[in-house]
UniProtKB/Swiss-Prot annotation:
Family: Belongs to the UPF0145 family.
Pfam families (UniProt xref): YbjQ_1
SUPFAM superfamilies: YbjQ-like
PANTHER family: UPF0145 PROTEIN YBJQ
HAMAP family: UPF0145
Superkingdom per UniProt: Bacteria
Stated name of the protein: UPF0145 protein Sala_0338
């Protein structure tokens, strides 16, 4: 499965547009609280633990989006956009969402 932020894949013309596909992942409060308590690896203002959690959430959201594209018969997703949104009363949750257009190339 190809996924790209661009609207085309050079050398692979789009044969069919199948529609918008999405994937969402929500990281809950307990995870962030646990990470806050154990931030001992901050180097230069960065936390490896937070970055790992965000990377996993992003990968899962992209995976869900690609799985939805495959269910529609697509073999690529173009125009991919990844968004992050804080949710909950105290900003206790983070949603990572990926969206794009499923296509056949």
């Amino acid at each position: 499965m190809f996924s790209t932020t661009t609207n085309n894949i050079e050398g692979h013309p789009v044969r069919e547009y199948l529609g918008i596909v999405t994937g969402e992942v929500i990281v809950g409060a307990n995870l962030f609280r646990d990470l806050f308590a154990s931030i001992t690896d901050i180097v230069g203002g960065r936390s490896g633990k937070y970055e790992d959690v965000l990377a996993r959430a992003r990968k899962e959201a992209l995976g869900e989006m690609e799985a939805e594209a495959a269910k529609l018969g697509g073999n690529a997703v173009i125009g991919v956009d990844i968004d992050y949104e804080v949710l909950g009363q105290n900003g206790s949750m983070l949603m990572v969402s990926a969206s794009g257009t499923a296509v056949v190339i």
